[in-house]
Amino acid sequence: MSKEKIAIAYSGGLDTSVMIKWLKDKYDADIVAVTGNLGQQKEIENLESKALATGASSFHFVDLRTEFVEEYIWRALKAGALYEDVYPLATALGRPLLAKALVDVAVAENCTMLAHGCTGKGNDQVRFEVTFASLAPHMKILAPLRVWEFTSREAEIAYAMEHNIPVSATKKNPYSVDENIWGISIECGVLEDPMIAPPEDAYQITTSPEKAPDTPAVVELEFVEGVPVAMDGKKMNGLDIIVQLNTIGAAHGIGRLDMIENRVVGIKSREIYEAPAATILHFAHRELERLTLEKSVFQYKKNISQDYANIIYNGTWFSPLRTSLDAFVNETQKPVTGLVRLKLYKGNVTLLGRTSPYSLYNEALATYTEADTFNHKAAEGFIHLYGLGLKTFNQIHKG
C-alpha cells in the first residue's frame, strides 16, 4: 500500500525546512515540496537538493513570474491597491498564486493533503487556506505551525540543528524575510518593538537614503490603459520594468516602509517593507490618473482602491467581488495612457512632469495670463446656486 502524499509550499526558510521532516515523521507520508518563483532574489538553485536532503520525496519548481506580474501585480496597480494607504501588498498578492500553483501540483501528483508553513497568528494562513478551500475543497489542509511543539523560532532553530537541517536563520539573525519581485517583508527580532528604528542589517536590498547617491536618477514611464509598457523610451515587458525599477530605486533608497497594520486575525503588527518598484509605479500611476480621470471617477475610485486592497490582504482573491471590481477598474483605466517623468533622490520620489493624449487639464482654462478663456462672470451665478442650500439652512437655524 502506497503512502499518502502531502504537498507543501516550500520556501527553503526555517519553518518549511523544519516542516518537511516533522510532517514526514508525524504522518508517515511522502512529501512533495513545491517552490514558486515570484522573482525572489535569494538563492533558489539549491532548493531542490536542500528539500530532498531534508526528507522530501520530490521537488517542483514553478516559474510564476510572468503570471504574477500580468495577472496579479498589474491588476493591483490599476486598482491603486495599497493596504491602509501604505502597503503595496507584495506578500499578500503572491499567496493566492502560490496556493494555486501548489494545488495544481498536488492534483497532478495525486496528493491528498496540502500543507503550508504559516503561523497561527498571521495573515498568510488565511490566504493559503481560503484559496485551498476555493480551488481544492476535497483536500485536507495541514497547518503544522498551529499545532506542533515548537513555541518559538529559537526552538525551531534548535530542532533544525539537532536533525542537521540546513537553515539560514540563527539566534543572532532572527529576522523572518519574505521576498518577491513586488517587495520584501521583514519581521521578528528587535523589529517587534515599534519604538526601535529598524537596524540597517534588517534591510535586504535598499541603500540607506543617507548613503544614497548625491546625483538623482530621472526615469520616464509610459502607461497604456493603466499598465506600464515602457521605461525611458524603451518598450519592455512588465517583468523587466519591475526588475529595473527595483535596481534603480533600491540604489536611491526608495521604498522603505515602516507601518503598524491591522492583521486579519485581529491584532496590530509592526511590519517593515522594501518595495522600490511598487513605490515608484504606484506614485506614477496615481499622478497619471490625476491628469486623466474625471473628478467624480477619480474620487470614487479611492473607495474601490481600499476595497480591492482589503480583498488582497484578507485572502479572498478568488472571489466574485474581486472579479466584479476588476470590471470597474478596467473601465476607469481606459484613458490612463501617457508619460510620467520622475526624479529618484535619497529616498524620495518627485514628480517632474506628465502628459497624456487624454489629459483633462486645459491650460487655456487654468491659466491666469491673457490667454485665459474661463468665463469669470459665470462664477457669480454658480456660487449663488452652489451655496443656496447652506444659506437657507443657516437663515432658518441661526435666525
Curated annotation (Swiss-Prot):
It comes from the Bacteria. Keywords: Amino-acid biosynthesis, Arginine biosynthesis, ATP-binding, Cytoplasm, Ligase, Nucleotide-binding. CDD domains: ASS. Pathway: Amino-acid biosynthesis; L-arginine biosynthesis; L-arginine from L-ornithine and carbamoyl phosphate: step 2/3. GO terms for biological process: argininosuccinate metabolic process; L-arginine biosynthetic process; urea cycle. Homotetramer. It catalyses: L-citrulline + L-aspartate + ATP = 2-(N(omega)-L-arginino)succinate + AMP + diphosphate + H(+). L-citrulline binds at residues 87, 123, 127, 176, 185, 261, 273. L-aspartate binds at residues 119, 123-124. One of its GO terms (molecular function) is ATP binding. This is Argininosuccinate synthase. Coiled coil: none annotated. It comes from Chlorobium chlorochromatii (strain CaD3). Its EC number is 6.3.4.5. InterPro entries: Arginosuc_syn_C (IPR048268), Arginosuc_syn_N (IPR048267), Arginosuc_synth (IPR001518), Arginosuc_synth_CS (IPR018223), Arginosuc_synth_type_1_subfam (IPR023434), AS_cat/multimer_dom_body (IPR024074), Rossmann-like_a/b/a_fold (IPR014729). The keyword Amino-acid biosynthesis applies.
